[in-house]
Amino acid sequence: MKKVLKIILATVLFIFIAIQFYQPALNVDKGQVYTTDFTQVYKMPIEIKAMFQTSCYDCHSNNTNYVWYDYVQPARTLVGTHIKNAKEDLNFNEWGTYSNRKQERLLNSIKEQIETKQMPLSSYTLMHKNAKLNN
């Protein structure tokens, strides 16, 4: 029994180490400022801009502020997939390229999701306490 357990643990450890070599591309834009960015299209107080960037931009922009555990597989792949899907729905850096109709629909969706506490995701605010939105 102990031998089987050792083999299983060694195999799991080997797989864990092996998957660390698979590192998907990071969502980092090197500090580029977009003229189409939500905070450029709508002039807003610095506090509101900071709130949006802290609570929304890690998933819904072209620049994510990664923390140490985001570099460890399988978290890296899970975070990368989540960011890719989030940006397909809404990318604040590309806001100015959206049609007026899409912007209005997204604004209504943002308002509703914040009011119903669907966003930011609880799984995100669990690890990023400063991203919680207060009433």
What do the predicted segments below correspond to?
Residues 129-134:
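Short, exposed beta-strand-loop hairpins at the edges of beta-sheets
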Residues 77-126:
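Extracytoplasmic electron-transfer domains, predominantly the class I c-type cytochrome c fold
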Residues 20-32:
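Aromatic-capped interface at the extracytoplasmic side
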Residues 30-52:
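Electrostatic cytochrome c docking/interface patches
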Residues 1-7:
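Positively charged n-region of N-terminal signal peptides that target proteins for export
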Residues 52-64:
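The canonical Cys-X-X-Cys-His
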Residues 66-78:
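Acidic helix-start/capping segments at beta-turn-to-alpha-helix junctions
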Residues 7-23:
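Hydrophobic membrane-insertion alpha-helices, especially the h-region
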